[in-house]
Each structure stands twice: as structure tokens, then as C-alpha cells.
């Protein structure tokens, strides 16, 4: 059987650029071991957004060579080219975290290119990355969420005092303030009282034009890996135990320094009710957001009430050596390489389903 041509896209004009490089290293290594695909490594420059074809995915970002003769051109209806040569890509595995990677942008472009793509499509990606609209949709399905409000920068500037009053009355303090469309806890801060809230909101608006504010609670952090298209598999949840951090921020997530006091428990120590609730909510969340391929769905269990809440959804979860997503899959018997291979198979499956529909009518002369 001839090998399929696979393009691994990583990097990106994103705050999570460096995390993407680390994820890509793991996936590239797995693809090399599988030896089932001709792998084309596509690096997106953080500053310019230019796409470069690399020989491999280096462990050290400093070794990435941005050769002008290796600039990638994408021409809808024709293909993906380097130096006027069609690479004849059969499937793309995007591992660009955050904006342009998880917001439906790359997914939309690949749909126009008519190339199968690992992971969710435009709709699921675009909704999931926007914390505010995602929460509004999940709320309409009666899925339990941490109490929240959201607003645009324009509305906030028109009525600062009214919004601050709403925060006090609806949520009370402390609250956690988040940019609506960023991951890896970037731009997130905690306001413990009214004197701190304005600074926290302004910091979040530096990253996004929409801000989400949630009630801050003492809670256990539970994560759940999900894969599949129509048929969905929910993996055994894991727990993140944070010892020296107020919340699971960027440093807690990605620091590899000795003494980083974050512990991963897989499986999470859950009673039967919590386990069933989390799996049920993960299933319905995946379905109602029309997710495909994979997702990591994060939960909170409030310590004071023992109630379970959906926290956030990641349509392209981290694949680094310390990421929970692959570790939860591995716990249930799906090792890293098999997971990567399965996700590629799901991309072909999703593409085939999409091609079954009628996209246009031919007019008879």
C-alpha cells in the first residue's frame, strides 16, 4: 500500500506558538515510528505568518531554518505547492494552538482546499474557542457551568459602572477574568474585590475584545479526553493537583523546572456519581458543539458544594510530553502512536462523510 502524504502544521501567529512546537515534536516522532505516512513539516512563522516547509520538526526551535526557497503556497482548486511543485497532500494534521489554529481559520482554509483535516471543523472550532459564546450555547442545553457574565470592550467603555455593579450582584468577589479567545491561561487574572476588577478587565482587553468573568471557586481540576466523530469515546478522566499556584496558569501548565508542584493523577480519584456525571457532560458537550476528531474537556468540582461544572473545551489539546490528553488515552490502552494514527483515520472518515452531501446543483442546458 502506498503511503499517504501528510502535512503536519505547527507554530502559528499565536501566543501559544512555543507550545505548538513542543506538541509537534511529539507527533512528528510518533509519525516517524508509525512509518505509514510521508510527512511534510509545515512551520508557520510567529511574526510574519509565512508557511515554510522543513525537513523535520527539530527539538530546538533555534534549529528551524526559514528558507525562502521553501515557502509554501496554497492554491484552492490546485493544491499545496513549494517551488511550483505540488506536494499532493492527502491529509493535514494541524497542531497550531490558539488563534488561527483552533478558531476555525485553518479548518476553513483546508475545507476550501478540499483536504481532509484532523480535528473539528469550522463550526465546532469557532464556537469552542470563544468562551463566551460557547458558554451561552452550553447553557441553553442545561449543561452546568460556573456562573459567568461576558461583555464586549465597546459596551464596557459605554457603561463601566453598570457592568461593575452587575459583576458584584451576579457573581460577587472573588472573580476570575478571562479574554474570551485565548488558551493556556494567558491573560487570566483574579480580582478579589472591586478595587482590583478594573485593572483585571483592562488586562484581559489587551488580549481580546470580549471578556468573560466567572465566579472564582475553590475547586478540583478534572480533565477528560474525548475522540471520535459520530461514535464517541470518553476516556477515564484525570485530575490536576495544584499545590503552589492559585489556579492552573501558564507557568503551572508548561513549566518543566525542577520543583514544579503540579501533580497529575490518572485516573482521577472520583466517586461513581462524579465519574458518571463528568462522562455524561463530556458526551453531550462534544455532541452539541458538533466536535470531531478530538477534544479535551475540562471540569471543575467545587470543593464547598461538590457540584460538577464544565470549565473549558480545547479542540486541539496539547500533545507535549507533559500534556494530559495523550496520557489519559494511554491509561485506557491507546498509546501515543496509536492515538495519532486513529485521529488521522477519523479525519479521513469525517471527510468522506462530508463528500456524501450535495454541495451544488448542476443546471441542465
From Swiss-Prot:
Family matches, as InterPro entries: ATP-grasp, ATP_grasp_subdomain_1, D-Ala_lig_Van_CS, D_ala_D_ala, Dala_Dala_lig_C, Dala_Dala_lig_N, PreATP-grasp_dom_sf
> Which cofactors are named for this entry?
Mg(2+); Mn(2+)
Sorted keywords for this record are: ATP-binding, Cell shape, Cell wall biogenesis/degradation, Cytoplasm, Ligase, Magnesium, Manganese, Metal-binding, Nucleotide-binding, Peptidoglycan synthesis
Q: ATP-grasp domain: which residues? A: 135-345
GO terms for MF = ATP binding; D-alanine-D-alanine ligase activity; metal ion binding
Compartment(s): Cytoplasm
**Residue positions binding Mg(2+) 1:** 298, 312
Which annotated residues bind Mg(2+) 2?
Answer: 312, 314
User: What are the record's GO terms for cellular component?
Assistant: cytosol
Pfam families assigned: Dala_Dala_lig_C (PF07478), Dala_Dala_lig_N (PF01820)
Give the catalysed reaction(s), semicolon-separated.
2 D-alanine + ATP = D-alanyl-D-alanine + ADP + phosphate + H(+)
Task: Please give the pathway this protein is involved in.
Answer: Cell wall biogenesis; peptidoglycan biosynthesis
| Predominant cellular place of this UniProt entry's protein | cytoplasm
Q: What class of enzyme is it?
A: ligase
Q: Which residues bind ATP?
A: 168-223
Does Transport show up as a keyword for this record?
Answer: no
Q: Does the keyword RNA-binding apply?
A: no
Q: What does this protein do?
A: Cell wall formation.
Give the family from UniProt. Belongs to the D-alanine--D-alanine ligase family.
Q: What name has this protein been given in UniProt?
A: D-alanine--D-alanine ligase
Organism, as annotated: Borrelia turicatae (strain 91E135)
Q: Which lineage ranks, top first, belong to the organism behind this chain?
A: Bacteria, Pseudomonadati, Spirochaetota, Spirochaetia, Spirochaetales
Underlying gene: ddl
Amino acid at each position: 500500500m502506498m503511503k499517504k502524504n501528510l502535512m503536519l502544521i505547527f507554530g502559528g501567529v499565536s501566543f501559544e506558538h512555543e507550545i505548538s512546537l513542543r506538541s509537534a515534536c511529539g507527533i512528528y516522532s510518533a509519525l516517524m515510528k508509525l512509518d505509514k505516512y510521508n510527512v511534510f513539516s509545515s512551520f508557520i512563522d510567529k511574526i510574519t505568518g509565512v508557511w515554510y516547509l522543513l525537513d523535520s520538526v527539530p527539538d530546538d526551535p533555534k534549529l528551524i531554518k526559514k528558507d525562502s526557497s521553501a515557502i509554501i503556497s496554497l492554491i484552492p482548486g490546485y493544491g499545496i505547492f513549494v517551488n511550483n511543485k505540488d506536494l499532493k497532500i492527502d491529509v493535514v494534521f494541524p497542531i497550531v494552538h490558539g488563534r488561527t489554529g483552533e478558531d476555525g481559520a485553518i479548518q476553513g482554509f483546508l475545507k476550501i482546499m478540499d483536504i481532509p483535516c484532523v480535528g473539528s471543523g469550522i463550526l465546532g472550532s469557532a464556537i469552542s474557542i470563544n468562551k463566551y459564546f460557547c458558554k451561552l450555547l452550553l447553557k441553553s442545553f442545561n449543561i452546568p457551568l460556573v456562573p459567568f457574565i461576558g461583555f464586549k470592550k465597546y459596551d464596557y467603555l459605554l457603561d463601566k459602572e453598570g457592568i461593575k455593579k452587575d459583576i458584584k450582584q451576579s457573581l460577587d468577589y472573588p472573580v476570575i477574568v478571562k479574554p474570551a479567545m485565548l488558551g493556556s491561561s494567558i491573560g487570566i487574572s483574579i480580582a478579589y474585590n472591586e478595587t482590583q476588577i478594573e485593572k483585571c478587565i483592562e488586562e484581559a482587553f489587551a488580549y481580546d475584545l470580549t471578556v468573560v468573568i466567572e465566579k472564582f471557586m475553590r475547586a478540583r481540576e478534572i480533565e477528560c479526553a474525548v475522540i471520535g466523530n459520530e461514535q464517541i469515546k470518553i476516556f477515564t478522566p484525570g485530575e490536576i493537583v495544584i499545590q503552589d499556584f492559585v489556579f492552573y496558569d501558564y507557568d503551572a501548565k508548561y513549566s518543566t523546572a525542577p520543583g514544579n508542584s503540579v501533580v497529575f493523577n490518572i485516573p482521577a480519584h472520583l466517586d461513581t456519581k462524579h465519574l458518571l456525571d463528568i462522562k455524561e457532560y463530556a458526551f453531550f458537550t462534544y455532541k452539541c458543539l458538533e466536535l470531531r476528531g478530538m477534544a479535551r474537556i475540562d471540569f471543575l468540582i467545587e470543593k464547598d458544594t461538590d457540584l460538577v461544572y464544565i470549565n473549558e473545551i480545547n479542540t486541539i489539546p496539547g500533545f507535549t510530553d507533559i500534556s494530559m490528553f495523550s496520557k489519559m488515552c494511554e491509561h485506557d490502552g491507546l498509546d501515543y502512536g496509536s492515538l495519532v494514527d486513529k485521529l488521522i483515520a477519523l479525519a479521513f472518515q469525517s471527510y468522506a462523510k462530508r463528500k456524501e452531501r450535495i454541495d451544488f446543483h448542476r443546471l441542465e442546458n
